[in-house]
């Protein structure tokens, strides 16, 4: 069926306004922070952006979708993709979150593998490292987070352990990939073996490679255990936060900015509001409860009849749990806990939007929603 189009009125365009100019060596691209649950990815994202764009909690698996935070500098624009923690899934939700991370790896320019300074490297870290190098040709920067939680000797030991992890997993896997590539080249009659393009070269970043359908060779490293680099950071004390952003920016392609100046995230307001309500509900929640909480925004509109200089935004959300017993925990005696959740969330929403908010939270039960495909689809997973 033919569609009707409204012609563009060129008279409304200000063609005299000068276009913004950027240095020839300006860089712009995507960096994904990956790691185990509760590795400090969201806290670091917020610190680099300079504003809260991702909710944080000491509960593992707080992040449930990829969140983009945008870092603006004179020399570069870095779009940070904060991902859910990679873990051994126990539910369909867990499987979908891992799939979400896997899909992200091929769409960014550089990976930041977050490893807490205060936790020994374990099987989960080895698994993630092997997945990163096996499924992506992108440079991987090892970021040792939570440096403020250990002393200098303990931090030095963790940095050495991270370097050893790179030697054990990253370098070994890269060597195997190079062997396989050489074998494929021989089978093709020696036609391969040319230097593949990398995100370091202009016009040869991930987007260009995807258009060409190419898979480039493993990225060069600086000798630190197979990592592109290793750097410690404390997002809480803002120790080396800018240094991490500067380091990651070195691996994104030459490009003008991809987002307007001043834009700190491309997340819809409804998504941010739902996340702030969930964050408030996670505080003080019992051990089994955090994973059972999901939040959706059902309605959001300014109340009619309010004065223009004193608007009020009505926000209605549904907070889902999996069992009736959990519903009563969320509500609390006489609704006391729900009021605390609402007050905490409303204050954060008002600070984010810059307007007064009336927040209505309706608690519902969606039985075993984490393993129900239809429920997951309704909740946006």
Predicted regions: what they are:
Residues 40-41, 149-150, 154-158, 234-252, ...:
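Conserved GTPase G-domain signal focused on the G5
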Residues 51, 70-74, 104-111, 131, ...:
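Conserved, well-folded catalytic cores of nucleic-acid-processing
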Residues 176, 228, 255-269, 358-360:
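Interdomain boundary/hinge elements
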Residues 2-31, 167-168, 172, 176, ...:
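P-loop NTPase nucleotide-binding/switch module
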Residues 266-381:
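P-loop NTP-binding site
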Residues 72-77, 96-228, 302-309:
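Conserved C-terminal guanine-recognition region of P-loop GTPase G domains, centered on the G4
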Residues 2-110, 115:
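Conserved G1/Walker A P-loop phosphate-binding module
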Residues 60-62, 84-87, 117-121, 146-150, ...:
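Conserved nucleotide-binding/hydrolysis micro-motifs of P-loop NTPases
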